[in-house]
């Protein structure tokens, strides 16, 4: 039984062993051929020649995280739609109805996010004051 599995998957085993060998070779050559500079100054973090002042932790607005989450969510949904579009002939009308329901749920979610203001980048107060008078 093990022989049958080994015969079927020998190419994958060769690929894995080759990938591991290439990685180990690159790490070994970098360790052997890489430049070495020891000293007290090398242990300090690089700050572009300027002594660091203050806290290194910067706070980002939650809007950046929202944009990233929306991108991931809608990108994954686009992958599902792409997979459906490749097999649209095999799935027939049932697949079409399922894709329509899926797209409808996406639109409902997008409308909900738009209504609660999650897609507004600037606060309402600033948007209203930045408009130019006609």
Curated annotation (Swiss-Prot):
Transmembrane segments: 12-32, 64-84, 93-113
EC number of the protein: 7.1.1.-
Membrane topology: Multi-pass membrane protein
Reactions this protein catalyses: a quinone + NADH + 5 H(+)(in) = a quinol + NAD(+) + 4 H(+)(out)
Membrane recorded as keyword: yes
Any GO CC annotation of this UniProt entry: plasma membrane
Predominant place of localization: membrane
Pfam families: Oxidored_q4
Root EC class: translocase
Keywords, alphabetical: Cell inner membrane, Cell membrane, Membrane, NAD, Quinone, Translocase, Transmembrane, Transmembrane helix, Transport, Ubiquinone
Keyword Iron-sulfur: no
Compartment annotation: Cell inner membrane
GO MF, one annotated term: NADH:ubiquinone reductase (non-electrogenic) activity
Primary role: NDH-1 shuttles electrons from NADH, via FMN and iron-sulfur (Fe-S) centers, to quinones in the respiratory chain. The immediate electron acceptor for the enzyme in this species is believed to be ubiquinone. Couples the redox reaction to proton translocation (for every two electrons transferred, four hydrogen ions are translocated across the cytoplasmic membrane), and thus conserves the redox energy in a proton gradient.
UniProt similarity note: Belongs to the complex I subunit 3 family.
Summary of subunit composition and partner proteins: NDH-1 is composed of 14 different subunits. Subunits NuoA, H, J, K, L, M, N constitute the membrane sector of the complex.
Protein name as catalogued: NADH-quinone oxidoreductase subunit A
């Amino acid at each position: 039984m093990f022989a049958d599995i080994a015969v079927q998957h020998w190419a994958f085993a060769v690929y894995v062993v080759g990938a591991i060998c290439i990685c180990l070779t690159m790490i070994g050559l970098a360790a052997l051929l890489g430049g070495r500079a020891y000293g007290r100054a090398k242990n300090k973090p690089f700050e572009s020649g300027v002594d660091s002042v203050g806290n290194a932790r910067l706070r980002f607005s939650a809007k950046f995280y929202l944009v990233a989450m929306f991108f991931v969510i809608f990108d994954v949904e686009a992958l599902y739609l792409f997979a459906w579009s490749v097999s649209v002939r095999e799935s027939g009308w049932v697949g079409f109805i399922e894709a329509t329901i899926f797209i409808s749920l996406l639109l409902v979610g997008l409308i909900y996010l738009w209504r609660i203001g999650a897609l507004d980048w600037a606060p309402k107060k600033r948007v209203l004051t930045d408009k130019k008078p006609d």
